[in-house]
Amino acid sequence: MEMEQVNALCEELVKAVTVMMDPSSTQRYRLEALKFCEEFKEKCPICVPCGLKLAEKTQIAIVRHFGLQILEHVVKFRWNSMSRLEKVYLKNSVMELIANGTLRILEEENHIKDVLSRIVVEMIKREWPQHWPDMLMELDTLFRQGETQRELVMFILLRLAEDVVTFQTLPTQRRRDIQQTLTQNMERILNFLLNTLQENVNKYQQMKTDSSQEAEAQANCRVSVAALNTLAGYIDWVSLNHITAENCKLVETLCLLLNEQELQLGAAECLLIAVSRKGKLEDRKRLMILFGDVAMHYILSAAQTADGGGLVEKHYLFLKRLCQVLCALGNLLCALLALDANIQTPINFGMYLESFLAFTTHPSQFLRSSTHMTWGALFRHEVLSRDPALLAVIPKYLRASMTNLVKMGFPSKTDSPSCEYSRFDFDSDEDFNAFFNSSRAQHGEVVRCVCRLDPKTSFQMAAEWLKYQLSASIDTGPVNSCSTAGTGEGGFCSIFSPSYVQWEAMTFFLESVINQMFRTLDKEELPVSDGIELLQLVLNFEIKDPLVLSCVLTNVSALFPFVTYKPAFLPQVFSKLFSFVTFESVGESKAPRTRAVRNVRRHACSSINKMCRDYPDLVLPNFDMLYSHVKQLLSNELLLTQMEKCALMEALVLVSNQFKDYERQKLFLEELMAPVVNIWLSEEMCRALSDIDSFIAYVGADLKSCDPAVEDPCGLNRARMSFCVYSILGVMRRTSWPSDLEEAKAGGFVVGYTPSGNPIFRNPCTEQILRLLDNLLALVRTHNTLYTPEMLTKMAEPFTKALDIVESEKTAILGLPQPLLEFNDHPVYRTTLERMQRFFGILYENCYHILGKAGPSMQQDFYTVEDLASQLLGSAFVNLNNIPDFRLRSMLRVFVKPLVLFCPSEHYETLISPILGPLFTYLHMRLSQKWHVINQRSILCGEDEIAEDNPESQEMLEEQLVRMLTREAMDLIMACCVSKKTADHTAAPTADGDDEEMMATEVAPSSVVELTDLGKCLMKHEDVCTALLITAFNSLTWKDTLSCQRATTQLCWPLLKQVMSGTLLADAVTWLFTSVLKGLQMHGQHDGCMASLVHLAFQIYEALRPRYLEIRAVMEQIPEINKESLDQFDCKLLNPSLQKAADKRRKDHFKRLIAGCIGKPLGEQFRKEVHIKNLPWLFKKPKPMLETEVLDSEEGGLATIFEP
């Protein structure tokens, strides 16, 4: 009767599986079939016989696979409820299936083999070794039955190692039992694997040349591949003694297989894992056999053979692995020589370097890049860096670097052998470009290491390359009329042009070498005359190509340190740089400047600035010449852009700091700022800055024309406003008093001392800046008011979007790839709207930068300005409701944070508290509303739809901006309230990267975080205190893991601890504790967040439970909480007389209590849990038994259910 039922059910199941797998089935039928199959697996009592019948080899593959899936489901989810006989029957049936129910090795489907091995491993995980002691013997018996069974045994051993050791997918006790039993049998297992490999390889090599035995040869090859894969799964964790046993027999076998095409990749994988292992010095020392003649011969010949037949994907993949093996060998050698002085450099070290250099000169950019780290380790190594073989390879390495630094090999191009390899490694030119830039940065570090060892050779080669480029004719490459090809204007170079890529590479090389050479050589050894000669050649070089000119400018900067030894050269250098400041590529044409031209001019200004910053003493004797140059350029209002003017003014200010005379510098700054003061304080400007309608008209935002070709009537007005703001910021940023206290005193910069004895300085620019402050605050107030809807309507149609975020910022915020090409031949601004957008954006940023710099720059002179708090509240904090998130974020970062951090404590009450109280309250209200909208949107639309369908959607941008504003607000609160620690784990960059990545490592909550004096001051004010607490604890429930992590570890507890001594309302305590539990629900899936939140909840409960019974009521609402366990926890907590358990045990107990509210990753939320029972302890030492207990014991040992 049962067989009839089985047959009938199997027929139904076959039909259902056929419907599921038939592409022509409708969705409805497919879902019904799936439901039937799932219900069968969950509920049917005769799953095992049905599964076995469906798994017979007479069935088609999809039916067999489903039958085996049924058996796997039974083992995973029903095993604990099965009787001993049922388990034995199922185990024997599966082993019989493997022995006689499989096809020949080349015919059997891989997915059938995979599921068969999974079933056996699932049974092993539940019963071995206690209840299945003969498992290894049974596998050995199976192994002898044929090639398919051999391969399956390999799969079983590999999967067992992966589940137990690599992925650890079973309970701790079971994992420990199985791993210890594996370790006990490891010699036997590895010998078995190695013998299997050798036997099958020998058979394969004998048969592969005989066409009549091709099938048998392939079968042996399959088993060999499986044996290599299984070895790879064990080599990673077994004792190194096993790997190096019998004079490294395993390693020797793997080296031999490097020349066997079908097996070389697996052999290289195993070698790589073995050589990369960490372990005892004595054990790792034996792996030095790989530097022997035989091993080196096999590695070299394998590399040559694989590379000989052109680009074949399989061979290329092998080359990558082999390159990694050589890298690991180099790292092994470095480690061993550093640890043991008795170890000698291998005789074949030179041969190793030659083979490694071959990978460095390979056309593949990926292979070249893979060698950088190891070269760096070799060149930095204390012992190897002095080795003659390594020193001899330096010229060859530098020569290779000169080729490798050239950016060639774009996947879309065909101008280099690298291109073909890049098409395998990169999806697009943008991917390649990002990879190359990162790789070149690493390469530069290695070049600097080489220069440290042999500066003269490095400089000589850099000099030769520079001379060659100066004498070579310009090759712009093939002309392409398509603008996206990146061809330059008027026949100039593009970023792909042969000449430009050579110039760019040479410049990078020269810069790396010279910077390091000046650090390495003594003054007497520096090749000053050669350096000056090179600088003279560069200064005499004439060219009009903007891209090449940028490289020339970098070379001037790189060679400039030589001028410190020949100061007479300085005027000549400045003369050249000033000629670049006014560079035009098309003569006196009034056409808009291109990006390439703008970049050259900015680069020149930046170079002058850098020289004045780094070598002010050198420039000071030539100050008058520099000043007259700059005054001449500034006299023509249209000659330079406002940024260029400001950069040159900054250069003058930097040199003026060397006056070290307060009065002299103050007079100079008055003279320098006179044009700015005249414009800024003029009646016309005052009216424009203080009246919104006048401002709109003054900047031209009410004009309807937006054609860039039409003359811009208000362009000069905007330029003047920008010039003033740029100049105020530049002067304030660059003016400083002497760093030496005695010099500062002598120069009149010190005006007194604080009560603690610190000197009080005065800044020479203070008077000038304070004169301009009122109008600056008026501009800030006016700019903020622009965002009101009624003011936006006063703007002409194209300019209503002028206050929006620019496209480039959107792209950066969304993390979208930047376009590879900057269109150098395009105008800087294509429309007046784009120009106006940039004007408003830079003006807004610079105003807040000025207010942010005012505190640290002018110190007490700024903080004692009359009614400063009310002036700032009436300007910078006006109309915040309409200010967009990206602007508010910028304001918090560049203005509010430095204003607070540099404020003397005596001004906390009068300045900081009146500003921060309303600000924190407002920020909490704004962020709560924003996150509520985002959470509602997620519920209504589904997260995936928002995040994946259209990453450029407005919703995605808004959410990311809210996230960034949240982080900035939390950062500000922490800067105000929390004392900085020496080891600050949140010192991650404020760049908004992937949250998951930041949460990858568990962060232990810190116990040394304390409130600052400012934090204590703020907490005295009830409104500020409430805003801080609510914001900190609310942030735990916002969907931003980084903000949650920071608040949990650094903010919540110190703030709460400050108010716990007072009287907290019960409702407030309930809300605070609930917020933490909600945070766990939201962020529990991230290990780092979860650990911190559990710790915080534990701290709060332990501290407040004795005083507030209400907190117990919150605990009782947690899903699946164990009330008895909670009673036990409370009993120990509330009864001081009971001995307290260790902190970790109490915390673990608490974590188990609140487990019901800890959020899980989406992938685990609906997954059926697998329960594996622990078996009797296998390796635990039993307690000594009394004689009477021994006599009374009925069982003499462990029961074994899988006895034959």
UniProtKB/Swiss-Prot annotation:
Region entry Pre-siRNA binding, spans: 641-642
Modified sites of kind N6-acetyllysine: 396
Keywords: Acetylation, Cytoplasm, Nucleus, Protein transport, RNA-binding, RNA-mediated gene silencing, Transport, tRNA-binding
Region named Necessary for interaction with ILF3: 533-640
Any one Gene Ontology cellular component term annotated for this protein: RISC complex
Major localization class: nucleus
GO molecular function, one term: RISC complex binding
Biological process annotations from GO: pre-miRNA export from nucleus; protein export from nucleus
Superkingdom assignment: Eukaryota
Nucleus found in the keyword field: yes
Compartments it resides in: Nucleus; Cytoplasm
Residue ranges of the region described as Necessary for interaction with Ran: 1-108
Site (Pre-siRNA binding): 441, 448, 718, 1045
InterPro entries xrefs: ARM-like, ARM-type_fold, Exportin-1/Importin-b-like, Exportin-5_C, Importin-beta_N, XPO1/5
Family recorded in the similarity comment: Belongs to the exportin family.
Its job: Mediates the nuclear export of proteins bearing a double-stranded RNA binding domain (dsRBD) and double-stranded RNAs (cargos). XPO5 in the nucleus binds cooperatively to the RNA and to the GTPase Ran in its active GTP-bound form. Proteins containing dsRBDs can associate with this trimeric complex through the RNA. Docking of this complex to the nuclear pore complex (NPC) is mediated through binding to nucleoporins. Mediates the nuclear export of micro-RNA precursors, which form short hairpins. Also mediates the nuclear export of synthetic short hairpin RNAs used for RNA interference. In some circumstances can also mediate the nuclear export of deacylated and aminoacylated tRNAs. Specifically recognizes dsRNAs that lack a 5'-overhang in a sequence-independent manner, have only a short 3'-overhang, and that have a double-stranded length of at least 15 base-pairs. Binding is dependent on Ran-GTP.
Assembly mode: Component of a nuclear export receptor complex composed of XPO5, RAN, dsRNA-binding proteins and dsRNA. Found in a nuclear export complex with XPO5, RAN, EEF1A1, and aminoacylated tRNA. Found in a nuclear export complex with XPO5, RAN, ILF3 and dsRNA. Found in a nuclear export complex with XPO5, RAN and pre-miRNA. Found in a nuclear export complex with XPO5, RAN, ILF3 and minihelix VA1 dsRNA. Found in a nuclear export complex with XPO5, RAN, ILF3, ZNF346 and dsRNA. Interacts with EEF1A1, ILF3, NUP153, NUP214 and ZNF346. Interacts with RAN and cargo proteins in a GTP-dependent manner.
PANTHER family, sorted: EXPORTIN 1/5, EXPORTIN-5
Protein name per Swiss-Prot or TrEMBL: Exportin-5
Lineage: Eukaryota, Metazoa, Chordata, Craniata, Vertebrata
